[in-house]
Amino acid sequence: KVVSDAGLDLHTVYPELSADKKLGEVLLTPTRIYVKQVLEVIKNCDVHGVAHITGGGFDENIPRILKEGQGFSVTEGSWEILPVFQCLEKWGNIPHREMFNIFNMGIGMVIAMPAADAEKAIAILAKHGNKAQIIGKVIEGENEII
């Protein structure tokens, strides 16, 4: 919808998105598969929940791993939001907060665990070539994502 409404061409290179890839190529970039790495994290850390951030973004996927009375506070700026999401927000005139409800904003997986295990999990994922970081924390609040 954003592509058609904004009059964009899938066969055009948009410099703010990519220096050399056409819009269509960027939008068709395949999803990473994390199964082996996540299983290793589960084996070595005290994992409380795993959420694959798909359609519905943060707001629909993270609550699935929260217990009753819990919410999640996202630390915006703790990871780099990819140019594709920045461009979609601008081109589609989508409110910034709504972007997190529609897209994964570059976060494919959220793994909930005690803070004490986070660095170990990050190291395991880095060993497999995945960039991981702490993006927030569990808070009190009924399925609230802030």
Language-model regions, residue ranges each:
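Mobile "lid/hinge" segments at catalytic clefts and subdomain interfaces of large enzymes
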Residues: 1-10
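Glycine-/charge-enriched secondary-structure boundary and capping motifs
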Residues: 9-146
